[in-house]
């Protein structure tokens, strides 16, 4: 039994206040990846760069996040996660300040990569919560922290859209730095130490991930299905602001409002966890991938509708696919966390590396397709990504991983 498993979570037990703190920390950290998306139209004008070049801002952020998860998150099994969370919080604050004071697109791109790498403190918080929580309430605790993380993803767009339009894009990055620093200080004062679960060296940790990937087919299936959904998820949100500006002449604040619709998807986290406990996570992944795909395909109807109904349909689609994507994500975490408790950080790192590679691909392809094939071309891409995830989840004859 690992050190993490023998640590006494009941003694270190998480109060409701501590769980809320961790959920807030995860939300603030992961939000840093998405602040740029609603302001892409503003960045095109103010930095005098092309749409495809500015599209590299969220792309590099997500690539940085994927690299940080793959190369840094496994350290959570080797070192005190509290120390890692605090260090990343300080570095993320500095990266956000660099974004705020960027003098041009090149500096902003470099800062975006740094933001992505350090924002992986969110992926240290989730397994930290799972380790500190007693087994009887672990699912509820992780679900609550994931709700904070998912709200951070979606509400970040709402906040960013308004702040960028009325106070400027630099103000948004500056405010984000203050929020991250504040929650980091609170975590420093409140979170207990978290014992390591292994004494393996860093090279051995990385090498063990290859064996985990090879040994666990459920991990591979979960990663592939979630990565495909992430392609569609990211392509939609990274191109929405530009499309709304070009087609409907709507500002970044309006684009941010669509994040409120998508925030409804965060409510799927506890609901999906509860259903997975009763009926098994495999069933929930099938429902989630199907709902996301149908919601993507619904936007093929846009050319047939008048403008007000087109906007309403986009809102309905956003609610539907976000609910499907987040339900599938929580169920996939339920699957992989049960595989090998002592390797939770590494298992989580492997799956989320795939997720954010998918997001980076979605951002990059979405921007290019929007520029050359329009919004309907983007919808084709979203639907194909959803269909791919459905194939992965429905190809199994079992309802359990």
PLM regions: where:
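Intracellular juxtamembrane helix-capping segments at the cytosolic ends
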Residues: 121-133, 325-340
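Juxtamembrane intracellular "pre-TM" segments in multi-pass secondary transporters
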Residues: 5-13, 191-224
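Helix-to-loop junctions at the C-terminal end of transmembrane segments
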Residues: 69-80, 268-281, 370
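Helix-loop-helix hairpin linking two adjacent transmembrane segments in secondary transporters
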Residues: 107, 137, 143-191
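C-terminal transmembrane helical hairpin of 12-TM major facilitator-type secondary transporters
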Residues: 283-331
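Conserved MFS/SLC helix-loop-helix module at the cytosolic interface between two early adjacent transmembrane helices
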Residues: 67-105
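Cytoplasmic helix-loop-helix junction between adjacent transmembrane helices
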Residues: 112-149
């Amino acid at each position: 039994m690992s050190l993490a498993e023998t640590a006494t979570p009941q003694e270190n037990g998480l109060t409701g206040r501590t769980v809320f703190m961790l959920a807030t920390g995860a939300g603030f950290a992961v939000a840093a990846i998405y602040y740029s998306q609603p302001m892409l139209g503003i960045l095109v004008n103010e930095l005098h760069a092309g749409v495809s070049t500015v599209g590299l801002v969220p792309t590099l952020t997500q690539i940085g996040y994927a690299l940080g998860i793959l190369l840094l998150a496994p350290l959570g099994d080797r070192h005190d996660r509290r120390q890692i969370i605090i260090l990343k919080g300080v570095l993320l604050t500095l990266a956000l300040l660099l974004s705020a004071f960027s003098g041009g697109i090149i500096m902003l791109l470099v800062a975006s990569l740094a933001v992505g790498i350090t924002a992986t403190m969110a992926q240290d918080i989730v397994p930290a919560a799972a380790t500190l929580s007693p087994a009887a309430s672990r699912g509820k605790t992780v679900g609550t922290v994931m709700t904070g993380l998912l709200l951070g993803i979606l509400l970040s767009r709402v906040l960013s859209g308004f702040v960028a339009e009325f106070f400027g894009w630099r103000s948004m990055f500056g405010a984000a730095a203050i929020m991250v620093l504040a929650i980091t200080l609170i975590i420093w004062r409140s979170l207990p130490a978290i014992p390591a679960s292994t004494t393996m060296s860093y090279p051995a940790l990385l090498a063990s991930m290859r064996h985990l990937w090879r040994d666990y087919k459920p991990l591979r299936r979960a990663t592939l299905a979630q990565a495909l959904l992430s392609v569609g998820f990211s392509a939609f949100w990274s191109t929405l602001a530009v499309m709304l500006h070009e087609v409907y002449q709507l500002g970044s604040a309006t684009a941010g409002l669509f994040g409120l619709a998508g925030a409804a998807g965060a409510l799927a986290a506890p609901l999906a966890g509860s259903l997975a406990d009763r009926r098994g996570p495999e069933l929930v992944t099938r429902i989630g991938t199907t709902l996301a795909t149908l919601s993507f395909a619904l936007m093929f109807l846009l050319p047939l509708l008048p403008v007000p109904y087109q906007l309403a349909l986009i809102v309905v689609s956003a609610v539907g696919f976000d609910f499907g994507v987040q339900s599938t994500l929580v169920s996939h975490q339920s699957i992989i966390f049960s595989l090998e408790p002592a390797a939770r950080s590494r298992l989580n790192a492997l799956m989320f590396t795939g997720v954010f590679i998918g997001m980076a691909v979605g951002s990059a392809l979405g921007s290019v397709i929007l520029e050359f094939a329009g919004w309907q071309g983007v919808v084709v891409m979203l639907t194909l990504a959803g269909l791919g995830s459905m194939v992965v989840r429905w190809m199994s004859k079992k309802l359990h991983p």
